[in-house]
From Swiss-Prot:
InterPro entries: TBP, TBP_CS, TBP_dom_sf, TBP_eukaryotic. This is TATA-box-binding protein. Belongs to the TFIID complex together with the TBP-associated factors (TAFs). Binds DNA as monomer. The keyword Transcription applies. The gene is TBP1. Sequence repeats lie at residues 25-101, 115-192. Keywords: DNA-binding, Nucleus, Repeat, Transcription. It comes from Glycine max.
Length: 200
């Protein structure tokens, strides 16, 4: 798939990714409204890939293998789909869950499908001085190594949260469209190079 942007699979568009690094999408969270009331007990009993424990959580948890995803299905007809690696896969998975519900006899529709969160990650392949970064970008950074090993960077534009690790591994979360993930990474990349650790 040309649009996946997997490292090493095809030349990187340097216009869009001046750093030469394209974050890989790891998880897409989407929601959809099936627009009908659901009997969760019936679904749990009749669908073979479903679990339902109302004492623990008020939704049926359903899984499919392709695309490898998990859905939370609520009695209201609202559904959350997690685990897909691209927007198209997330929508395809959500449609498959909707079809399963239809086959069980519910008049499920497919309304208001929406990507709620995109999680991406990448590796800048050099170590980063997190203390220095946290000090000079104090307004956006929280870094408490005894609580969590990564620096949490809350970017304002686009509104993305980045987890930055000493190793040079970066996690980006909070995007609604993949370009926000890419823009956030390009914004932070010069900062990361500025706080590059010198290898002894």
């Amino acid at each position: 798939m040309a649009d996946q942007g997997l490292e090493g699979s095809q030349p990187v568009d340097l216009q869009k990714h001046p750093s030469g690094i394209v974050p890989t999408l790891q998880n897409i969270v989407s929601t959809v409204n099936l627009d009908c009331k659901l009997d969760l007990k019936t679904i749990a009993l009749q669908a073979r890939n479903a679990e339902y424990n109302p004492k623990r959580f008020a939704a049926v948890i359903m899984r499919i293998r392709d695309p490898k995803t998990t859905a939370l299905i609520f009695a209201s007809g609202k559904m959350v789909c997690t685990g897909a690696k691209s927007e198209q896969q997330s929508k395809l998975a959500a449609r498959k869950y909707a079809r399963i519900i239809q086959k069980l006899g519910f008049p499920a529709k497919f309304k208001d499908f929406k990507i709620q969160n995109i999680v991406g990650s990448c590796d800048v392949k050099f170590p980063i001085r997190l203390e220095g970064l946290a000090y000079s970008h104090g307004a956006f950074s929280s870094y408490e190594p005894e609580l969590f090993p990564g620096l949490i960077y809350r970017m304002k534009q686009p509104k993305i949260v980045l987890l930055i690790f000493v190793s040079g591994k970066i996690v980006l979360t909070g995007a609604k469209v993949r370009d926000e993930t890419y823009t956030a990474f390009e914004n932070i990349y010069p900062v990361l190079t500025e706080f590059r650790k010198n290898q002894q």
